[in-house]
């Protein structure tokens, strides 16, 4: 940007701008956007006055070629660009000779024909907003305001534009050229966004009584009174160097601001160790459903009835056996637990009337799996406060894990389309206002793109499981209730379908606090052989429970059916959020909406229809080692949704920390890409804060590896 300014503007203007910035303690090399803005403003002021004269008769005339004999007086006195002392001297002399009221702020020009001061504004925003800010700041009827924008708009006091059309057109053309030149060098966006509003001087108002006493009590250390603190704040130079600001604030701080260059950032260090394992509350891409179409059986909609009906669609059950044991668990107990579920479901069918819920017998295998009587006994603090060596358990540091390829596959799968629709197009009443019409149009387009997405299936599955588990936890606190894992969808032909993924058995659930844990055992059907990626299934015991006939291109093939069993736990607060997973749809819709808004503001009309219907256009989806991945607008919707859903499924403190800390580094890198010349201090500390969140969580590790791809491509 600095080079551009020096090439684009007359050397005299550049010199004046540098002088003005130095007077305010600003550096043209650092605040390059401000440098460009000051030069532009100076040039507009000079162009405003160029060629305008007043002849002997006091008439205003335009003379383009200089006639040395003519007795002409410049129509405008230029005040902008002079140093402050000189500028006020000129103003004082004008006011003394003409009797015009003296302005409070330094204006830019004086018009000898109209006998008024002029404030010139050049804005990258809306002219009327800038006009109001200027008017608010000067609060003077006498000073005439004239605002130009880079888009050719202008606004002046009482629509009196002072100059003829041709002179104003010259100024507008020049501003447009500057904008084009900046845009062609990739400088315009950053320049446009860097404009700040006019600072208005606040009127002082006195604080008295109680508020005054509170103010005096709440001062920072070393300040005796509010006045003394105010004086300090007012004297605080807002645009000095950061180092100076910091040392003004505290004697202990000494930060060196280092420039952040393309070569500065290094990739994030991902942990070494065994590959990370699956930790979601239910299976994702590996889940298998037993389904019934057009359910119309008696008691349809009662989970237990639906589950039994789904189980009856499968005929390939066989004697279960363990194919992948759980390293630390008592595996025969998992096997016995599954056999118990089968036996108790059989018992239900032999009863006259099927009950609505099923509580499992409290067998030794279930007590073990659900951690019954495993919690250490709670002792009243009064009884043990005299124990001399009372201490908290030592807990081990979590073991570091490396990124495994399965989590990227999980994410890719979540972005794919399934052959069923998982959400209904909500029928909402007629739109009354135009904005409602646009909103429902966007919602309908978005719903069409994501209703068949696998991430949407995960949402509905998550909502169902968490709702059922929270209900059972409150309604049957002491019981080991059997909870079917069910979802509902519609086929391509619009037929209703009920799916069973497996079962959950809930442990004792006296949940007083939000964070109290309820244990559960999950048993889920799958066709995935766990021996292919044993590290993914570290927390599971996997049984082979049947053979399933699958239709393929070469006819029917038989595949072993597996049951993934594990002990897990959740809490009231986690279940509450799980029940609200539909919010992910809203979050991703809002992200898409901001993309549409950006398009619409450029084109100055609503672009919703074009945005979704222009199938040829591709959009950036994300970074991969290959570069920036692009795809259709539908793919963008589904990717954003999948990210939001995974943030919910894999929510963790590691993710919270990583998201917050890596965002800071992301903003610095984006500032560098926008040529804003960012500076940093303690970059090492920021890396430390990010990397302490990279421990063993698969979703966080995947995000960190995406972040590294982004760094590589962003800094090329």
UniProtKB/Swiss-Prot annotation:
InterPro entries: INFV_PA, PA/PA-X, PA/PA-X_sf. One of its GO terms (cellular component) is host cell cytoplasm. Mn(2+) 2 binds at residues 80, 108. Its cofactor is Mn(2+). Disulfide bonds: none annotated. One of its GO terms (molecular function) is RNA binding. One of its GO terms (biological process) is cap snatching. A motif (Nuclear localization signal 1 (NLS1)) lies at residues 124-139. Keywords: Cap snatching, Endonuclease, Eukaryotic host gene expression shutoff by virus, Eukaryotic host transcription shutoff by virus, Host cytoplasm, Host gene expression shutoff by virus, Host nucleus, Host-virus interaction, Hydrolase, Inhibition of host RNA polymerase II by virus, Manganese, Metal-binding, Nuclease, Phosphoprotein. A motif (Nuclear localization signal 2 (NLS2)) lies at residues 184-247. Phosphorylated on serines and threonines by host kinases, including human casein kinase II. Its EC number is 3.1.-.-. Mn(2+) 1 binds at residues 41, 108, 119-120. It comes from the Viruses. Belongs to the influenza viruses PA family. Influenza RNA polymerase is composed of three subunits: PB1, PB2 and PA. Interacts (via C-terminus) with PB1 (via N-terminus). Plays an essential role in viral RNA transcription and replication by forming the heterotrimeric polymerase complex together with PB1 and PB2 subunits. The complex transcribes viral mRNAs by using a unique mechanism called cap-snatching. It consists in the hijacking and cleavage of host capped pre-mRNAs. These short capped RNAs are then used as primers for viral mRNAs. The PB2 subunit is responsible for the binding of the 5' cap of cellular pre-mRNAs which are subsequently cleaved after 10-13 nucleotides by the PA subunit that carries the endonuclease activity. This is Polymerase acidic protein. It comes from Influenza A virus (strain A/Turkey/Minnesota/501/1978 H6N8). The gene is PA.
């Amino acid at each position: 940007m600095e080079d551009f300014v020096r090439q684009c503007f007359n050397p005299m203007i550049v010199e004046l701008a540098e002088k003005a910035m130095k007077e305010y303690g600003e550096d043209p090399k650092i605040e390059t956007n401000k440098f460009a803005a000051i030069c532009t403003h100076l040039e507009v002021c000079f162009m405003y006055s160029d060629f305008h004269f007043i002849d002997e008769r006091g008439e205003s005339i335009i003379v383009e070629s200089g006639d040395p004999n003519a007795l002409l007086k410049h129509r405008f006195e230029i005040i902008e660009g002079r140093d402050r002392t000189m500028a006020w001297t000129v103003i004082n002399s004008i006011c003394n000779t003409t009797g015009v009221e003296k302005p409070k702020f330094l204006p830019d020009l004086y018009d000898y024909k109209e006998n008024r001061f002029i404030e010139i504004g050049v804005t990258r925003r809306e002219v009327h907003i800038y006009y109001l800010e200027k008017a608010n700041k000067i609060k003077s009827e006498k000073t005439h305001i004239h605002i130009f924008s880079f888009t050719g708009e202008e606004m002046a006091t009482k629509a009196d534009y002072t100059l003829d059309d041709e002179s104003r057109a010259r100024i507008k053309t020049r501003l447009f050229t500057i904008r084009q030149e900046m845009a062609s060098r990739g400088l315009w966006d950053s320049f446009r966004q860097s404009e700040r509003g006019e600072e208005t001087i606040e009127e002082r108002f006195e604080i008295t009584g109680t508020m005054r006493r509170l103010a005096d009590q709440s001062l920072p250390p070393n300040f005796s009174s509010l006045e003394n603190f105010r004086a300090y704040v007012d004297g605080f130079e807002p645009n000095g160097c950061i180092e100076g600001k910091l040392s003004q604030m505290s004697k202990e701080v000494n930060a060196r601001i280092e420039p952040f260059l393309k070569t500065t950032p290094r990739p994030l260090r991902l942990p070494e160790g065994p590959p990370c394992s699956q930790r979601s509350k239910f299976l994702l891409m590996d889940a298998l459903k037993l389904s019934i179409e057009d359910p119309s059986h008696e008691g349809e909609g009662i989970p237990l009835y639906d589950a039994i009906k789904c189980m009856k669609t499968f005929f390939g059950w066989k004697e279960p056996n363990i194919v992948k044991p759980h390293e630390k668990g008592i595996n025969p107990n998992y096997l016995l637990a599954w056999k118990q579920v089968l036996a108790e479901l059989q018992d239900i069918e032999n009863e006259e009337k099927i009950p609505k819920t099923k509580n499992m017998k409290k067998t030794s295998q279930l007590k073990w799996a659900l951690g019954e009587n495993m919690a250490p006994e709670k002792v009243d603090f009064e009884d043990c406060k005299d124990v001399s060596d009372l201490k908290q358990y030592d807990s081990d540091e979590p073991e570091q894990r490396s990124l495994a390829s399965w989590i990227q596959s999980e994410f890719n799968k979540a972005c794919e389309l399934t052959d069923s629709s998982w959400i209904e197009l909500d029928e909402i009443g007629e739109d009354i206002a135009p904005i409602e019409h646009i909103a429902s149009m966007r919602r309908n387009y978005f719903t069409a793109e994501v209703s068949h997405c696998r991430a949407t299936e995960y949402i509905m599955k998550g909502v169902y499981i968490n709702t059922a588990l929270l209900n059972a936890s409150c309604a049957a606190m002491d019981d080991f209730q059997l909870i079917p894992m069910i979802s509902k969808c519609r086929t391509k032909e619009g037929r209703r379908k009920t799916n069973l993924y497996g079962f959950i058995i809930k442990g004792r659930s006296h949940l007083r606090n939000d964070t109290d844990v309820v244990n559960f055992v999950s048993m889920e059907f799958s066709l995935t052989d766990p021996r292919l990626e044993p590290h993914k299934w570290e927390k599971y015991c996997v049984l082979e429970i049947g053979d399933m006939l699958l239709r393929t291109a070469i006819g029917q093939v038989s595949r072993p059916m597996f049951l993934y069993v594990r002990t897990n736990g959740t809490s009231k607060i986690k279940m509450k959020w799980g029940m609200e997973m539909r919010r992910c749809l809203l979050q991703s819709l809002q992200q898409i909406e901001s993309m549409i808004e950006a398009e619409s503001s450029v084109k100055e009309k609503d672009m919703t229809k074009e945005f979704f219907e222009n199938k040829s256009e591709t959009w950036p989806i994300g970074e991969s080692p290959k570069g920036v991945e692009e795809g259709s607008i539908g793919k963008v919707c589904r990717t954003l949704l999948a990210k939001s859903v995974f943030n919910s499924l894999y929510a963790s403190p590691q993710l919270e920390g990583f998201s917050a800390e890596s965002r800071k580094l992301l903003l610095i890198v984006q500032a560098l890409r926008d040529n804003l010349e960012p500076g940093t201090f303690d970059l090492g500390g920021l890396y430390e804060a990010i990397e302490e969140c990279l421990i063993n969580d698969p979703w966080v590790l995947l995000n960190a590896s995406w972040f590294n791809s982004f760094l590589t491509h962003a800094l090329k």
